[in-house]
């Protein structure tokens, strides 16, 4: 389980996140939503152990702050919003970075085929020999997802769940590949891992998230199921838009129809 209690994060003298609680069980996709500047990325980086924080965060019963980088890398992989590569790496070389996990020397034999399998999962078969910088933004995003999948390919390790932390994983993708990536996340969770993802598309969030955490001005505005959190009044207040939340009879999942900005 990922558990956070009273988490606060400051950058310099500015408080970015204040008093946020969160619990995510293995088998779940948890979505963090909120307007730009609400503290989502900062909170995700604290959860994954990439930023210092106040309060408590634990992963699989261990305090994140006490974990060595190699320990954390064995059980969680992080997809950032953007990954700038300055060197002329091929796609295969970028994906293989996910296999390092703090290791040095030769990679274990059982990992040799993982880069190609990961590229196939994100529908980039045959791209391994191409240069990363030559790809479109959406293709680069899928390469980075293949990299993090290599890092935690098996959703369970030594009887413990592994975790994907995804910061806007579908922001550069067309609708087909958005669904492809979210299906990969759902499959990872169903096989015993867990996913924490920052998403902006509220309808995609409703389709895939088991639990939603709504952030507003650095604090948690709401937490719960899609039906509990995607409400007209809450979403209008947090995002400052006029909208209508409906529920089709077929699956009962809420859908969000924006109408206009709040004047």
Where on the chain are the PLM-derived regions?
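Conserved structural motif at the start of ABC-family nucleotide-binding domains
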Residues: 2-4, 17-19
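The feature captures the beta-strand-to-loop junction immediately N-terminal to the Walker
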Residues: 33-35
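Helix-to-loop junction immediately C-terminal to a conserved catalytic motif
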Residues: 48
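Conserved ABC transporter NBD signature motif
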Residues: 53-63
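Conserved ABC ATPase "signature" region
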Residues: 109-127
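Conserved ABC ATPase signature
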Residues: 131-135, 139
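ABC ATPase nucleotide-binding domains
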Residues: 231-232, 236-263
């Amino acid at each position: 389980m990922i558990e956070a209690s009273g988490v606060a994060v400051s950058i310099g003298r500015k408080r970015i996140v204040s008093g946020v609680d969160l619990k995510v069980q293995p088998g779940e996709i948890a979505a963090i939503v909120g307007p730009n500047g609400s503290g989502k990325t900062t909170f995700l980086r604290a959860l994954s152990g990439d930023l210092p924080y106040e309060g408590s965060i634990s992963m699989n019963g261990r305090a994140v702050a006490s974990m060595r980088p190699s320990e954390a890398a064995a059980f969680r992989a992080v997809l950032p919003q953007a990954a700038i590569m300055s060197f002329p790496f091929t796609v295969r070389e970028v994906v293989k970075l996910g296999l390092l996990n703090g290791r040095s020397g030769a990679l274990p034999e059982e990992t040799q085929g993982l880069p190609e399998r990961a590229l196939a999962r994100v529908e980039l078969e045959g791209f391994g020999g191409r240069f990363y910088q030559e790809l479109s933004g959406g293709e680069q995003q899928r390469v980075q997802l293949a990299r993090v999948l290599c890092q935690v390919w098996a959703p369970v390790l030594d009887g413990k769940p592994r975790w994907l932390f995804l910061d806007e994983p579908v922001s550069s993708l067309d609708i087909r590949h958005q669904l492809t990536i979210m299906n990969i996340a759902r499959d990872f969770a169903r096989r015993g891992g867990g996913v924490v993802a920052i998403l902006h598309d509220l309808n995609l969030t409703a389709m895939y998230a088991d639990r939603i955490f709504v952030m507003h001005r650095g604090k948690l505005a709401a937490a719960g199921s899609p039906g509990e959190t995607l409400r007209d009044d809450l979403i209008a207040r947090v995002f400052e838009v006029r909208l209508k939340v409906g529920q089709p009879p077929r699956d009962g999942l809420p859908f969000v129809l924006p109408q206009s900005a709040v004047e």
